[in-house]
């Protein structure tokens, strides 16, 4: 399936980070108002839910029907590992002041729920302990939430899927047939929100959904379990709900705890500035220095999943994957040139062509040919200002300059010589995210940038 998905970004005004939450579509509507809407990350300290939701966009292919997924509702809270930077987002659906920082976010979520095509909504949570209908101990009792399928009532007035209890019970049985450990058994939890006048649950997202005559289910995984196990149980439940809705799918990994762990922890890709630069993050170094940043373009980027963000902080930028820090970038500000976006060079004696922002695997060596009015800088290979026309082996590389701790991945950068003024041919990428709150550049920084060669783009080479 496509690695970088087409994503609609809904902008919310968030204190400090101002991160947007994203919404992706997977599959094609059959015009039967049978789309399933799935939310993750409504609380930022629940990684099982937001990782499961993210995988539905990056690693699933819906072959019949359609899902809409918003995996990172409280994205700023996810990055900060906070339940909610502006209070509990899941308690703002009954009423919210227009002055609340989450107001626009809540309105956008409601708009998604009220889409005519949406007939079922699934909200993913991680909760402490294990819900049990009867008291066993402090972590296994009726007041706990973990490993439960939660409904607000047994039945609703809806044209599709009115029997919430029956559907949720089927899901519980389905999950329990694939437990990693019998102690993880799921149970149905009916909060009887309206019947009992539960003042907290009356404010929640799922109650807003059923109040608008649509089926809603919350799936809880236990915070006492590792993240991959939580996501595993979420996906087991989601797949059963999708089957209930007649939605068919395939996925790129085996649905086991190990398969989910591998999918969550696979190599990340971040593409910067109209996809000119690829950062392939496979156990990356904690700091990457002298990363070209443009003074004449917007600071945009794309990622291989919707939980990864590039965030400005002082004089640097850092990359975060959900709750987890990846690396910090220290920029070198330059003018960028739009003259071309691919190069042809030799890899292990064979000619290959690669686009900027891509990675090429190398067994033995590579050689970048001389290019008129262009110089080449191979980061970690120190043989002069222009390093084209030289056969490069892994043994020639200084491993401390690799992107990864294993010393295998290196940047190869291309520059238009100052004063050449090559014809500009490329167009800007309009489907990218923006790095917010980058500091304004001083006159000296701009002057320095305009005295240097212009950055064209870069590729990565990965030695075996």
Spans of model-derived segments:
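Structured catalytic-domain cores with a bias toward divalent-metal coordination
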Residues: 2-3, 17-464
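Sec-dependent N-terminal signal peptides
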Residues: 3-13
């Amino acid at each position: 399936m496509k690695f970088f998905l087409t994503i609609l970004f809904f902008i919310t005004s968030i204190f400090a980070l101002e991160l947007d939450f994203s919404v992706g579509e997977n599959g094609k509507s059959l015009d039967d108002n049978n789309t399933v809407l799935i939310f993750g990350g409504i609380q930022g300290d629940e990684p099982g839910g937001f990782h499961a939701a993210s995988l539905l966009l990056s690693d699933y292919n819906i072959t019949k029907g359609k899902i809409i997924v918003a995996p990172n509702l409280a994205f700023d809270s996810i990055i900060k590992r906070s339940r909610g930077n502006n209070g509990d987002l899941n308690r703002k659906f009954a009423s919210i002041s227009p002055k609340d920082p989450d107001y626009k976010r809540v309105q956008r979520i409601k708009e998604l729920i009220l889409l005519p095509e949406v007939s079922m909504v699934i909200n993913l949570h991680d909760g402490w302990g294990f819900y049990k209908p009867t008291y066993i101990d402090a972590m296994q009792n009726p007041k706990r939430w973990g490993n439960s399928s939660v409904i607000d009532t047994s039945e609703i007035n809806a044209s599709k899927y009115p029997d919430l209890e029956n559907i949720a019970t089927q899901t519980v049985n389905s999950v329990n047939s694939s437990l990693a450990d019998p102690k993880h058994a799921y149970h149905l939890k009916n909060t009887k929100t309206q019947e009992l006048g539960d003042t907290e649950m009356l404010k929640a997202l799922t109650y807003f959904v059923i109040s608008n005559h649509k089926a809603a289910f919350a799936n809880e995984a236990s915070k006492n379990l590792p993240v991959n196990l939580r996501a595993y149980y979420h996906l087991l439940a989601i797949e059963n709900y999708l089957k209930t809705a007649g939605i068919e799918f395939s996925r790129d990994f085996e649905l086991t705890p190990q398969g989910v762990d591998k999918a969550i922890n696979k190599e990340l890709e971040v593409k910067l500035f109209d996809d000119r630069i690829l950062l392939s993050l496979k156990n990356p170094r904690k700091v990457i220095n002298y990363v070209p940043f443009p003074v004449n373009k917007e600071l945009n980027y794309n990622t291989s999943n919707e939980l990864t963000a590039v965030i400005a902080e002082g004089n640097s930028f850092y990359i975060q994957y959900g709750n987890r820090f990846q690396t910090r970038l220290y920029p070198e500000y330059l003018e960028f040139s739009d003259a071309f976006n691919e190069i042809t060079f030799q890899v292990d004696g064979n000619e290959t062509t690669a686009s900027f922002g891509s990675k090429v695997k190398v067994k033995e060596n590579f050689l970048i040919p001389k290019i008129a009015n262009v110089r080449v800088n191979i980061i970690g290979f120190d043989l002069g200002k222009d390093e084209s026309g030289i056969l490069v082996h892994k043994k020639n590389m200084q491993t401390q300059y690799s992107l990864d701790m294993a010393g295998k991945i290196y940047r190869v950068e291309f520059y238009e010589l100052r004063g050449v003024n090559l014809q500009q041919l490329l167009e800007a990428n309009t489907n990218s995210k923006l790095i917010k709150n980058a500091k304004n550049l001083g006159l000296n920084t701009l002057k320095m940038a305009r005295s240097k060669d212009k950055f064209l783009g870069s590729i990565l080479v990965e030695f075996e």
